[in-house]
Amino acid sequence: MSAVRLLWAQMKRRAPRLANLIRIPVLVFFRPRRAYTRAHLACVRAYDESIRWISRLIEGALAHAVEVQRTRGLVRGDGGNSVGYRLEAAAASLGIRYLDKRYRHVFQDTLSVQWDRWFGSEHFSGESIVLAIGTLGPGGSERQVVTTLLGLAAAGYRDLYLLCTYSGGQASRFYAHLLEGCPVTISELSAGLGDAHDGGGGDEALPCGGLKVLRDKLPDDLKDIACFARDLLARRPRIVHAWLDWNNVKAGLAAAVIGVPRIVLSTRSITPDNFPLFQPYMREAYRALAEHPTVCLLNNSEAGARAYEQWLGLPHGTFNVVRNGFDFSSLEPANKVAPAREFRARLGISHEAPLIGSVLRFSEEKRPLLWVDVAARVSERRPDVMFLMIGDGPLREETRRHAEACGIGDRIVMPGYEKDSASAIAAMDLFLLTSRVEGLPNVLVEAQALGVPVVTTHVGGTAETLVQGETGYAVFPHSADLLANAVLKILGNAPWRQAARKAASQFVRERFPVSRMLEGTLDAYFGGGEFAKRRDR
């Protein structure tokens, strides 16, 4: 064995391309999840993308993705037309196709079983609705879950449940206080089946034999589908509405297996293979669920819907678009003048200083380092401008160091999370977003509702949130220079800013009312007209 390892080490050093070609098919059979990661790395040669995939390769599994510093020199920039690149890409493609085939068989086998004998789909006759999401942490999707629950309650629905994968800790309950007084029961996903397989678990009504069969049929990375099935069986809902890819796949498959009459899956961005927590089973899971007669697929932007359809090879129109909805009563610009002044005073920001800001998670896909690069270029021409970055995340300290290295560390304020993000946004003169990938960002809508013009990278559905040249700018390509030019253009045109404040507030109120989002959601639940009937009661 030591001789084999020595030969392998020499091969990796002297012939790395050949070593990679050998390694991928070997990993496919012995460590398929790691092979999937390595395969993607072989296909990606852009600098930022390569660093992302290297970070996951180090961990050995996509589920344990890490954020790493963007250190130069980790990946050699081989040309896309080189023989080595083409050979490695071909090997990568074989690995990906193998995994797709593997998971396709898993889902086909699971959904082909006649589960009625265990779970009895005829018992799903109540009115309960279960929404499933990871947490109620400080994210845009989480905020929309809360808005949906509040809207359903206002429309007359009382049998509401929220199933969170994790609800412990303050950060994971960031929006929970908004549901106080709302007729919704919040619970956390069971950690396992416990004694359900032998008739225990504290609920004699649960079909324990079926849960055990389901769990035993699934590979290790999908066994928690049985946990979703257990918790959903305890409620026997008429509707399961899952949010975000991980929950869509696992809660969706669990709901399909146990016979929930209506399953709605809300995708909230572009395809999951653009994000660190992507899992190799997701594509085939979505394909299997798309063919299920009780499943309705949603996205919150046209760009996101079309991206999923292309990724999955599905016909145009398979994904319906239900845009985010907002209660604009809490986003009146006139009501935020005093809180905005108080916010600036609390952070020591002069009321006279132009303030460019953002609300973001300090993570790779939000590109906070690019945000700082834009700020540095703006400050070169406008030394009076201050900068504000609201939020937290794994790259926060690196972002702070980068700002200091750019010479603007004393002009960027990073206070962490703010409960009252609306007052923070209202204190800004311009909102800047530099994301690499996005769905339909809540913050862009909220900023415009408060009369704050926006500059954003043109990705996903960002351009759908604004009127180009009237309420802000969606910029492409995503260079710091182009983004800085858009920012400076707005800062240097006071009449334009005044007109944009009014136009932006009016535009988002017409396009993103909560009533329209609820109507689309209830159409997905019941079909046309249900929202109107409830509203007229």
Where are these regions (language model features)?
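N-terminal strand-loop element at the rim of the active site
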Residues: L41-R97, K101-R104, D109, D116-G126, ...
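A short, active-site helix/loop in glycosyltransferases that binds the activated sugar's phosphate group
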Residues: G84-S93, H292-P333
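A conserved mid-protein helix/loop that constitutes part of the nucleotide-sugar donor-binding site
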Residues: E142-L150, P354-E380, P394-R400, D481-L482
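Short His-centered aromatic/hydrophobic patch
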Residues: D221, A242-N248, T267
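Aromatic "clamp/platform" in nucleotide-sugar-dependent glycosyltransferases that forms part
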Residues: Y417, R436
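Conserved acidic donor-binding segment of nucleotide-sugar-dependent glycosyltransferases
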Residues: V467-G469, Y473-A480, K489-P495
